[in-house]
C-alpha cells in the first residue's frame, strides 16, 4: 500500500491487515515510525513483510524544523519492535533539510546505523515550487538558482539548497557518504 497515511488510523490499518490475512498474501505498506507493537503484531500475523518508513533525520531539531511530528526515541522503539517481530524495514532519509549541518548529517548516519533498517534510501531535500520548503529557501537565500530544476539532464537529483554553514556540494556528497558508512560498516 503506497499510502503515507496508512498507519494514521490504527483500527483501519488493523482491519485491512486482517482482510489481507484472509487472502493469504504477503504485502507491504508505508508506515510512520510510531506504530505501536500490538498493531505491528497484527499486521505481521496477517502477512506483512515490509514497511517503508520515512525517518528523514536522526536529529530531533531537524524533525521539529520540518514539522515531522516524530520523536527520535519513539522511532527507535518502533524499529526495535519491527526487528523483534521479523518485519523488514526500508528506511528513507533526507539530507539538506533546514537546520542541517555536517554534524546533524553525521548524527543521522549514526542513527541509521543504530536502528539498522534492512535497506535504506537517502534523498536530497527538494524544495518543490509551492511547498513551504521552497518558500522558506527562497526567503532565506538558500536556493541555488542554477539547480532550480532539482534534477540534471540525466535525471540525477541535484542538491539545490545551501546554507551559510553547508554548501550544496557538501550536501550532495553526503548522500554517497551516508550509503558508504551504512552499507560498508564493519560487523
Predicted region positions:
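A structural motif corresponding to the C-terminal lobe/cap of the Radical SAM core domain
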Residues: 5-11, 15-186
Amino acid at each position: 500500500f503506497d499510502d503515507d497515511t496508512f498507519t494514521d488510523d490504527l483500527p483501519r490499518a488493523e482491519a485491512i491487515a486482517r482482510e489481507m490475512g484472509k487472502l493469504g498474501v504477503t504485502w507491504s505498506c508505508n508506515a510512520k515510525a510510531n506504530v505501536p507493537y500490538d498493531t505491528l503484531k497484527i499486521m505481521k500475523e496477517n502477512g506483512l513483510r515490509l514497511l517503508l518508513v520515512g525517518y528523514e533525520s536522526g536529529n530531533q531539531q531537524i524533525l521539529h524544523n520540518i514539522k515531522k511530528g516524530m520523536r527520535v526515541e519513539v522511532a527507535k522503539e518502533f524499529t526495535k519492535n519491527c526487528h523483534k517481530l521479523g518485519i523488514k524495514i526500508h528506511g528513507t532519509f533526507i539530507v539538506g533539510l533546514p537546520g542541517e549541518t555536517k554534524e546533524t548529517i553525521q548524527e543521522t548516519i549514526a542513527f541509521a546505523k543504530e536502528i539498522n533498517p534492512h535497506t535504506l534510501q537517502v534523498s536530497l531535500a527538494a524544495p518543490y515550487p509551492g511547498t513551504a520548503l521552497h518558500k522558506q529557501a527562497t526567503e532565506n537565500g538558500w536556493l541555488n538558482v542554477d539547480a532550480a530544476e532539482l534534477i540534471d539532464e540525466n535525471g540525477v537529483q541535484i542538491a539545490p539548497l545551501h546554507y551559510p554553514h553547508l554548501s550544496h556540494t557538501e550536501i550532495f556528497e553526503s548522500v554517497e557518504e551516508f550509503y558508504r558508512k551504512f552499507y560498508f560498516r564493519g560487523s
